[in-house]
């Protein structure tokens, strides 16, 4: 049997965890978590990390293993997953990867472009310029030095705009010149160097919009009742870390600063989480290789996977 990676994906709060555990038990597989925030050990409540009981049902990887001081990226995740799967496939024919971090899933399935290491002086300079001159100034600069990437980049995402300029000022070459990987409209990767030594089956989970939004609101209430504000208070000294630039913590930091009332923060968390869920679905729906199911269709999902093994 050809080694197969089953990727369970979908928006936040859709119900990935329970289905993933059921599939892991059925296929006798560990779980490769794919959440760029759950990988940090001090962010359990705000990221809805797996509970101790859930962790006992299957061996988990990439959960709570990093400190907030550790830098992590989709490129590092890709390499670590490939290294881990090479070992796990020696004893497992099927592995389950589950999560909603779009760039991380894409990195594992399709590979990631080989971006040069950024010069720290360049990074520091551009970070300062962003604060002093604002995003619009840097966007205008990117348009001049790399018009191709300017047309493509999310112009509201300061991190991505700055990163493109970091690459340009580090190498003297436009960021777009390093982006060699292309994808077809049907989602199939055409870069031969990125073909994986295992099959990939993508299972997308979706619910009706109002059902999903209701689950998101309920999850936020549960987080608050479980001590999200207290967790955020403990993380306040580290609030400048990139890992904490995350829905849930950002809003609670405003409460702790005295800027917002708790009720306002809770409503903002719900709203921002709903926005993020819509962004996830927009991203995933572009990939026509994903087979979509309601999370309660477990038997249909199992049959679909078995038919492709």
List where the protein language model places each region.
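Phosphate/pyrophosphate-binding catalytic cores of soluble transferases and nucleic-acid-acting enzymes
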Residues: 1-309
């Amino acid at each position: 049997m050809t080694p197969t990676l089953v990727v369970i994906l979908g928006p936040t709060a859709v119900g990935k965890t329970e289905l993933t555990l059921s599939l892991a038990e059925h296929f006798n597989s560990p779980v490769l978590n794919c959440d760029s925030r759950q990988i940090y050990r001090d962010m359990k409540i705000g990221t809805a990390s797996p509970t101790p009981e859930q962790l006992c049902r299957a061996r988990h990887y990439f959960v709570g293993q990093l400190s907030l001081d550790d830098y992590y990226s989709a490129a590092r995740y890709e390499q670590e997953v490939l290294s881990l799967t090479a070992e796990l496939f020696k004893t497992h024919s099927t592995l389950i990867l589950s999560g909603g971090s779009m760039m991380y899933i894409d990195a594992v399935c399709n590979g990631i472009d080989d971006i040069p290491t950024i010069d720290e002086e360049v990074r520091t300079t551009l970070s300062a310029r962003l604060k002093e001159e604002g995003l619009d100034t840097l966007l205008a600069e990117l348009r001049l030095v790399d018009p191709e990437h300017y047309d493509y980049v999310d112009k509201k995402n300061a991190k991505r705009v700055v990163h493109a300029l970091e690459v340009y000022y580090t190498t003297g070459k436009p960021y777009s010149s390093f982006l060699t990987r292309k994808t077809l409209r049907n989602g199939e990767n055409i870069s031969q160097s990125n073909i994986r030594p295992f099959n990939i089956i993508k299972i997308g989970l979706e619910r009706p919009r109002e059902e999903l939004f209701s689950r998101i609101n309920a999850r936020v209430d549960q987080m608050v009742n479980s001590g999200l504000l207290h967790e955020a208070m403990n993380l306040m000294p580290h609030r400048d870390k990139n890992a904490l630039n995350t829905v849930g913590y950002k809003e609670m930091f405003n409460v702790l600063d005295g800027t917002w009332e708790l009720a306002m923060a809770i409503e903002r968390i719900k709203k921002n989480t709903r926005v993020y869920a819509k962004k996830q679905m927009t991203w995933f729906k572009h990939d026509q290789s994903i087979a979509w199911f309601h999370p309660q269709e477990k038997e249909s999902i199992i049959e679909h996977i078995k038919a492709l093994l």
